[in-house]
A protein has these predicted regions:
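Alpha-helical transmembrane segments in inner-membrane proteins
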Residues: 1-319
Length: 319
């Protein structure tokens, strides 16, 4: 049996569990009997939450894959080049400018901030010709820390700490109807990678080789940055941060299937969705009836895998 078939079956099982498990009892028997309360719970809470997990997880995993492709660095991802922290900064600035900022205003500020600071980071890495692959995440973590510190200072100075924490903590517990629709913008990056997978794969060969093969490298690089910034922004304003997801999932898949996006795109989306769904289900049952933050579980798993990847990458560069 193909791994993709197994992952698809596992995903369906996790979707079933995600809809079934929660603080409120959900009965499939009542669901198929068209019980009004059960259907209300399904439509207003369980279904939106499950859909938001699938969209956020698959799109953020794909954003990591795309970031690694355009930088030719396996450790690049929204969380390691400052994109995630920049989106958080944009959200805080939106709350400062508009105390009762709408989701649209938060989205625009987060998007503008994330694309601006990501461009600055990539320009810095290019100007100083940082060649070692393992240096990118280290510099990126420092860079993210600086942005995060500025964000904290602004939030503290203008009494926005509580609002910032509530909006940026990775959790799906508050997802309901009319609160997750922005995540459908994540479909843009999924469709783009699906349609342009061969073109993005050629970008792995570098700028000179890509342009010699007729690829408009600069245009596609800007498109990729736009897609990554958009995906990171809508995820941040809707569910908060999903740490290390964009790093570990593409790396695990590329080690098995190589750098051809035509072969990795589906697997990256499936593994990302399965991982976040599993973490979300665990977050509901570990201290039931209370919930843990999904970002906490993802952070524990992701940090361990990331350290292992970083250690192996450093050893290869040393050799």
């Amino acid at each position: 049996m193909k791994l993709s078939h197994f992952l698809t079956g596992l995903l369906l099982l996790l979707v079933f569990l995600s809809i079934s498990i929660g603080t409120s009892d959900f009965s499939w028997e009542k669901f198929f009997a068209f019980d009004q309360q059960t259907w209300l719970l399904f439509q207003e809470s369980r279904l939106p939450r499950t859909i938001s997990i699938l969209l956020a997880a698959s799109s953020m995993s794909m954003a990591g894959l795309l970031m690694q492709t355009i930088t030719q660095n396996q450790f690049a991802a929204p969380s390691t080049v400052g994109t995630t922290e920049a989106a958080k900064l944009g959200m805080v600035l939106s709350l400062f400018v508009f105390p009762s900022a709408s989701l649209t205003q938060k989205m625009l500020f987060a998007f503008g901030s994330s694309i601006l600071f990501t461009l600055f980071f990539l320009a810095f890495m290019t100007i100083f010709s940082v060649k070692e692959r393992w240096m990118l995440p280290l510099i990126g973590i420092i860079y993210s820390g600086i942005i995060g510190s500025v964000t904290e200072v602004i939030a503290y100075r203008f009494n926005l700490v509580q609002s910032m924490t509530a909006w940026t903590q990775g959790s799906f517990s508050m997802i309901q109807t009319h609160q997750y629709e922005w995540l459908f913008l994540g479909l843009i990056i999924l469709i783009a990678v699906w349609k342009l997978s061969q073109t993005f794969t050629i970008m792995n060969l570098g700028k000179e080789t890509s342009e010699s093969l007729g690829i408009s490298y600069s245009l596609l690089e800007k498109l990729a940055l736009f897609l990554v910034a958009l995906t990171t922004s809508v995820t941040m304003i809707t569910v908060g941060g999903l740490p290390f997801l964009g790093v570990i999932v593409p790396n695990l898949i590329r080690k098995r299937y190589g750098d051809n996006l035509s072969q990795t795109k589906l697997m990256v989306a499936l593994v990302g969705a399965n991982l976040v769904l599993a973490c979300d289900i665990l977050s509901r049952v570990l201290i039931r009836p209370y919930e843990l933050s999904v970002s906490l579980l993802l952070g524990i798993i992701g940090s361990l895998v990331f350290i292992l990847l970083l250690w192996r990458g450093g050893r290869k560069d040393a050799v």
